[in-house]
Curated annotation (Swiss-Prot):
Descriptive protein name: Aminotransferase atnJ
EC number: 2.6.1.-
Binding site for pyridoxal 5'-phosphate: 79, 216
Record keyword Transferase present: yes
Keyword annotations: Aminotransferase, Pyridoxal phosphate, Transferase
Organism: Emericella nidulans (strain FGSC A4 / ATCC 38163 / CBS 112.46 / NRRL 194 / M139)
Length: 348
């Protein structure tokens, strides 16, 4: 008799999960597991033609007992609902979201990396207008899918150099920069590819209205760290932007809560561009990026380069936050926040 979860394997995943929206009943279908890597989609689907699509990114880890835990699924479900509302996709109930994510991971459980590995299983929920529909209006057919695959940190583990992206505004003040839609990412690809060829691992966005405040990195949230000292002991102040044009990052929120639990001071507020020179560390944080140290930030038109207290190794704040956050995610530290949800076996 086989055991659940299955032991890790080294080949590709088994398939994905699908659910379809029934416009006559106004409900989503029960999720089904499809043993295929491809979707059958109408060529005139609004998701392909008009960008009517939203997505999420989340992770599953094996704990020390071999069980599989998913990190903060409720937060991702709620964020996906906000994204759906922004582009007129029917809301995906939290119960359906969890059932679909659980099914996708359970049916691919042998591909969740071992506990001792630095890798995890990346989970990609995606929803889009799927039927043939020519009008520039919300159509009647939608599809919700969940993919999963083994994954390592997007930017690696070493500090990276960043550059301010001046050629493109990521989001307008009353736009959709605060939700996860593909249109926020595709226009950046050209510039991030160019930046990588020039030696910059990541691009940073300033606010589009004044270009005087920090918004976020193209792939992740921005966190600034200032060192403090009291009684001969080093302390930390963590500063994160509260711009209305940025994604509500689940990882950034988690970092803030971990920092507070460690007794660090936390400031959530607008961050002026001119404050960059006063940070001791800068971090890029996100589900795919994890917590990445920023070695430097370059602003070309101003001929400025801000260098931080990191060279070939992450700074002390980055190391502490990464250790505690990863410890919770992998079950090595007690989950006092209630962030983890265990994947249950699916027999059908």
């Amino acid at each position: 008799m086989s055991t659940f979860p299955a032991e890790p394997r080294s080949d590709i995943v088994n398939g994905h999960v699908e659910s379809d929206f029934n416009y006559q009943t106004g409900t989503w279908s029960e999720p089904v597991f499809v043993q295929d890597h491809y979707l059958k989609v109408h060529g005139l689907a609004p998701g392909l033609n008009y960008g009517q699509q939203v997505f999420e990114g989340m992770k599953a880890y094996r704990d020390p007992n071999g069980q599989i835990q998913i990190f903060r699924p409720t937060d991702h479900a709620l964020r996906m609902q906000r994204s759906c509302d922004a582009v007129s996709i029917p809301s995906i109930p939290e119960s359906l979201f969890w059932a679909s994510v659980n099914l996708a991971v359970a049916k691919n459980s042998e591909f969740v990396p071992p506990h001792a590995s630095e890798a995890a299983m990346y989970i990609r929920p995606l929803a889009f207008g799927s039927g043939g529909w020519m009008p520039v209006a919300a159509g009647p057919q939608y599809k919700f899918v969940v993919y999963a695959l083994p994954f390592c940190a997007y930017h690696g583990t070493l500090p990276v150099d960043a550059v301010v992206l001046e050629e493109l505004d990521r989001a307008a003040p009353l736009g959709v920069g605060n939700v996860k839609v593909g249109g926020n990412y595709a226009p950046v690809l050209k510039w991030s590819d160019k930046a990588r060829k020039e030696g910059f691992g990541i691009t940073l966005h300033l606010d589009s209205k004044t270009r005087g405040e920090i918004d976020e990195f193209s792939t992740s949230g921005f966190v600034g760290i200032k060192y403090t000292e009291s009684g001969g002991e080093k302390g930390y102040t963590l500063v994160v932007p509260n711009s209305q044009c940025i994604i509500k990052s689940v990882t950034s929120t988690s970092v803030v809560e971990v920092a507070r639990s460690l007794g660090w001071r936390v400031e959530v507020r607008p961050i002026p561009y001119d404050e960059l020179e006063f940070f001791d560390e800068v971090l890029a944080v996100g589900t795919a990026a994890m917590i990445t140290s920023i070695r430097s930030i370059t602003h070309r038109s101003k001929d400025q380069v801000f260098r931080y207290k990191t060279s070939d190794e992450p700074g002390s704040a980055c190391e502490k936050l990464s250790r505690h956050l990863k410890g919770i995610q992998k079950g090595d530290e007690k989950d006092t926040f209630g962030w983890l949800k265990r994947v249950e076996e699916v027999t059908v």
